[in-house]
From Swiss-Prot:
Name this protein carries in UniProt: NAD-capped RNA hydrolase NudC
Source domain of life: Bacteria
PROSITE patterns per the UniProt record, alphabetical: NUDIX (PS51462)
Record's catalysed reaction(s): a 5'-end NAD(+)-phospho-ribonucleoside in mRNA + H2O = a 5'-end phospho-adenosine-phospho-ribonucleoside in mRNA + beta-nicotinamide D-ribonucleotide + 2 H(+); NAD(+) + H2O = beta-nicotinamide D-ribonucleotide + AMP + 2 H(+); NADH + H2O = reduced beta-nicotinamide D-ribonucleotide + AMP + 2 H(+)
Description of how the protein assembles with itself and partners: Homodimer.
General function of this protein: mRNA decapping enzyme that specifically removes the nicotinamide adenine dinucleotide (NAD) cap from a subset of mRNAs by hydrolyzing the diphosphate linkage to produce nicotinamide mononucleotide (NMN) and 5' monophosphate mRNA. The NAD-cap is present at the 5'-end of some mRNAs and stabilizes RNA against 5'-processing. Has preference for mRNAs with a 5'-end purine. Catalyzes the hydrolysis of a broad range of dinucleotide pyrophosphates.
Chain segments annotated as transmembrane: none
Gene Ontology molecular-function annotations: magnesium ion binding; manganese ion binding; NAD+ diphosphatase activity; NADH pyrophosphatase activity; RNA NAD-cap (NMN-forming) hydrolase activity; zinc ion binding
Motif (Nudix box): 175-196
GO biological process: one example: NAD catabolic process
Length: 278
């Protein structure tokens, strides 16, 4: 029997009473010793600087709402925590919920006004969209498709590090899909741009929402076909082949980047394939 999901998205009526809520400000999400979900009625009594409110889904069967604040404030007995920390430390179902909430919050902040005429927009009831009456324009949450690929050569994997990475960490190659190209075209282009390597036998491995701030990661495995590694200036700090028995520090366990690496290690060793989170 398939275990029911703890978190499911939905567009809920913000005029309804009750439910739970998460609070997002410029310092992350509000939390206390019980977590990031609070009784909605209790939050309303705090008179927080709410910029917008959104009904976002159900967690363990309970309706959940999102309060987007104009700025973070001090709440007695609570603290603020960034989304990445929830991914690294907390319940993955909670991270999925907060990842969705973070993307809704980003969309709500960026589309308070119409990009065509500058007039204020309004939420459309029953739909995840903002609306400009003047231009008859609907504004939906942004999703940015991107690819991530593990390139392999026998018992070696090609890993690279960006100047933005934490010290010492290496990961698979990644990049955003350009208008007019397929995900597969993107993989070939990005690998060539970033390390000047040709690839073959592309295999789709799965996808993962990456809410930093609104990426949809499409994961691939590819085999090395030729070329010497030449890191892209300003984008790739270092790139090299690593033997599977001598790997550097890797991305977080819950990331698709780590999954691609672990899946290949399992394939080479004959171990069971890992499960892609989320």
């Amino acid at each position: 029997m398939t275990r029911p999901q703890r978190w499911t998205t939905a567009v809920l009526d913000v005029e309804a009473d009750g439910g739970l809520a998460v609070v997002q400000g410029d310092q992350g999400f509000l939390l206390d010793s019980n977590g990031a979900l609070f009784p909605r009625s209790w939050l309303r009594a705090l008179d927080l600087p709410v910029q917008s409110e959104h009904g976002i889904g159900y967690f363990d069967g309970e309706p959940v709402y999102l309060l987007v604040l104009q700025h973070s404030v001090v709440v007695e007995g609570c603290a603020w925590q960034g989304l990445r920390q929830f991914m690294l430390e907390g319940d993955f179902a909670v991270f999925q919920m907060l990842g969705y909430a973070a993307q809704v919050a980003t969309w709500a902040r960026e589309h308070r006004f119409c990009g065509a005429c500058g007039r204020a927009t309004v939420q459309i009831a029953g739909e995840r969209a903002m609306y400009c009456e003047h231009d008859n324009l609907r504004l939906y949450p942004r999703i940015s498709p991107s690819m991530i690929v593990l390139v392999t050569r026998g018992d070696e994997v090609l890993l690279a590090r960006s100047p933005r990475f934490v010290s010492g960490m290496y990961s698979a190659l990644a990049g955003f899909v350009e208008p007019g190209e397929s995900a597969e075209d993107c993989v070939h282009r990005e690998v060539m741009e970033e390390v000047q390597v040709r690839i073959k036998n592309l295999k789709y491995m799965g996808s993962q929402c990456w809410p930093f701030p609104h990426s949809m990661m499409l994961g691939f495995h590819a085999q090395y076909a030729g070329g010497d590694i030449v890191p892209q200036v300003d984008e790739i700090e270092d790139a090299r082949w690593f033997h599977i028995d001598d790997l550097p520090p890797l991305p977080a366990n819950r990331s698709i980047a780590r999954y691609l690496i672990e899946a290949y290690l399992a394939e080479r060793s004959g171990a069971p394939e890992p499960v892609l989170p989320g």
